[in-house]
Amino acid sequence: ANHEGFDKAAEEGANIINIHHSKPLNPVINYPFYVRDSLVNFVEHEHSLGRKVKLYYTIRELTNYAAEIHALRSLGHEIFVSGVGYGLPWHCEHLIDDYKPAWYVELPGGKADAALVLNGFSRWINYYLEGLRWMFENYKIDGIYMDDVSFDRPVMKRIRRIIEKYR
């Protein structure tokens, strides 16, 4: 189960892989629940070779593939940041206005990952942390990769407790 040259990197001594979003194993941003089976199989394969796997998972934005997106919008601006809207085609068709568009990438089959900016200080943190706990328990990941962290110390301590419990 090669991941874009990781087997070659492993030959040179690499033993940890970061699975970023917008890649076949993790196609949409911050919603790795969408591709459970392929991730589980990949992590098991890498572990069998003595390698570790970290998964991209932040709280900055959320894909339009999230099943919860319309329920979260019903909470006003608590979860999604307010904005002009009228962003990408998916946004215009399904949300129209009053949101701030974020990450966008075209996916195979003419689909797109069209994320929305999240408010990082809301009840969504609890949902995010439960998702993190679930991934450690069910995917058996070894860690997460975050390229933007806006968590306060208490949230980082909660993240640490989750990681320490499962790894």
Where in this protein do the model-derived segments appear?
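Hydrophobic faces of well-ordered beta-strands that scaffold small-molecule active sites
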Residues: 1, 17-19, 53-57, 144-146
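Catalytic domains of carbohydrate-active enzymes, especially glycoside hydrolases
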Residues: 2-25, 138-139
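Conserved structured core elements
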Residues: 3, 28-29, 33-40, 122-129, ...
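Acidic (Asp/Glu)-rich catalytic clusters
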Residues: 6-13, 40-50, 136
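Active-site beta-loop-alpha junctions enriched in small/polar residues
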Residues: 22-24, 58-62, 149-151
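Aromatic-lined substrate-binding rim segments of carbohydrate-active enzymes
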Residues: 23-55, 155-164
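Active-site-adjacent "subsite" loops/lids of carbohydrate-active enzymes
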Residues: 44, 55-139
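Active-site and adjacent substrate-binding regions of carbohydrate-active enzymes
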Residues: 46, 120-167
